[in-house]
């Protein structure tokens, strides 16, 4: 009887590890070394820690499992999981533990094998930010921006009206001060 209990416990541990290994957020954290040089070892330790957490707390709620996993990811991998996968993984782990508690080894094996079959390799790629773009490309390209100006609630077609002169003292603009872009060069009075 003790052998069957140990075997079930080992099966639950293998199922937990399979679920964690299939978790894209953890895969990305390990692949990119978010946990430092020992990221792989931390991921392996994480499986044992989660398994032990379930054994020490037999009647866990889903949000408790989510919080525990979220804390582990933050503390060990400096990662905040925001892709919506945290509740899914927590639910899988909780379902596995319920199968373990009922002694339903067949369901536990089936669930672990399904997770292993569906496991896919993910890779994170960084998107270039505005500061990382090539400066040569910026100098050679012309960027256009469409602006809709409002004048007393009525939208105009991307053209802002020129300000009206405010009176007879208004400064007259010389034609050479208007650049071809439509910008006006403002000069200080001497």
From Swiss-Prot:
A Pfam family this chain is assigned to: WGG
InterPro entries membership: Pre-rRNA_process_TSR2 (IPR019398)
An annotated GO cellular component: nucleus
GO BP, sorted A to Z: maturation of SSU-rRNA from tricistronic rRNA transcript (SSU-rRNA, 5.8S rRNA, LSU-rRNA)
Keyword Hydrolase: no
Keyword rRNA processing in annotation: yes
Keyword terms of this UniProt record: rRNA processing
Region called Disordered, residue ranges: 152-176
Recorded family membership: Belongs to the TSR2 family.
Biological role stated in the UniProt entry: May be involved in 20S pre-rRNA processing.
Protein name, per record: Pre-rRNA-processing protein TSR2 homolog
Lineage: Eukaryota, Metazoa, Chordata, Craniata, Vertebrata
Gene: TSR2
């Amino acid at each position: 009887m003790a052998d069957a209990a140990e075997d079930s416990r080992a099966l639950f541990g293998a199922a937990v590890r399979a679920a964690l290994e299939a978790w894209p957020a953890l895969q990305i954290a390990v692949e990119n070394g978010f946990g430092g040089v020992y990221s792989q070892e931390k991921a392996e330790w994480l499986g044992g820690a989660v398994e032990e957490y379930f054994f020490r707390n037999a009647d866990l709620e889903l949000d408790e499992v989510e919080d525990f996993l979220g804390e582990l990811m933050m503390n060990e991998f400096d990662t905040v999981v925001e892709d919506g996968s945290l509740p899914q993984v927590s639910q899988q782990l909780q379902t596995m533990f319920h199968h373990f508690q009922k002694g339903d080894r067949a369901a536990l094996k089936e669930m672990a094998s399904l997770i292993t079959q569906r496991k896919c390799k993910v890779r994170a790629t960084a998107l270039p930010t505005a500061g990382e773009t090539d400066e040569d490309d910026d100098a050679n390209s012309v960027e256009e921006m469409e602006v809709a100006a409002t004048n007393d609630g009525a939208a105009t077609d991307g053209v802002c009206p020129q300000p009206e002169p405010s009176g007879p003292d208004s400064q007259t603009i010389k034609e050479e001060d208007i650049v071809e872009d439509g910008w006006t060069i403002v000069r200080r009075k001497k």
